[in-house]
């Protein structure tokens, strides 16, 4: 397994975080540390910065710990899901941070390890848990959800047009034997989708696997809590960067942050009170894709969309100190 994978949009991430991380005593959070690629680049680019890395995947944490070991006491790695960031910062005694990075979705390591069950291109156990120490597996979902629940998962999280058809086939086939490995599911999806639909869009199982992964790991629910919590943790002039890999993630990030970028008063109010002014300034115009050059060098960048924002003010009634947190 390659543990020195190339992280996506590294130069752009560093460029966006640069103004915030050059401040004395700067702290940056890598909320999805994975194999440590972005973290390593940030620590090299900013020799004085302290990095707090989170990941729910203990295997990934061990790899990143080895990769970052030479950087010593500037690194804190925590086994945590990113919506637990407030608890992590409280435990570490960190009142605010200067930058937060999210690199969402499944990691290259998780895809490469057959036993994790994320890849539909190889027969493997239907696990798909990012944290293998807890939670139901993809097999549990397939073998226990009824038709309506499975349809909801496939439709909402996979945007699968043939969700009910696939769900019915799953419920019918599991009566003969429970689902345990990915190859059987791939075959079922292929057989459930009309031939015309199978001829475009890549592997027909792609959407089903995405939906199951999101359901197993509660990815969108966690992200909806995590992004506002991360923004709340920023000091004034702190910056947030999010790399998304499908439209569900990207739309959610935009939706939860957008209200902070506009005044919290009616649009026809002639004067905006100070406590109603926006607390967020967008640093990107919409969602930025990777360049053609980056995609040629790193295939994973083909689906990435980047959004970044800066905190421009504290919430009403709270004054943020860029180096000392809330005061």
UniProtKB/Swiss-Prot annotation:
Its EC number is 2.1.1.199. S-adenosyl-L-methionine binds at residues 36-38, 55, 89, 103, 110. Its main location: cytoplasm. GO terms for molecular function: rRNA (cytosine-N4-)-methyltransferase activity. The keyword rRNA processing applies. It is found in: Cytoplasm. GO terms for biological process: rRNA base methylation. Keywords: Cytoplasm, Methyltransferase, rRNA processing, S-adenosyl-L-methionine, Transferase. Pfam families: Methyltransf_5. Residues 286-327 are annotated as: Disordered. NCBIfam families: 16S rRNA (cytosine(1402)-N(4))-methyltransferase RsmH. Specifically methylates the N4 position of cytidine in position 1402 (C1402) of 16S rRNA. Belongs to the methyltransferase superfamily. RsmH family. This is Ribosomal RNA small subunit methyltransferase H.
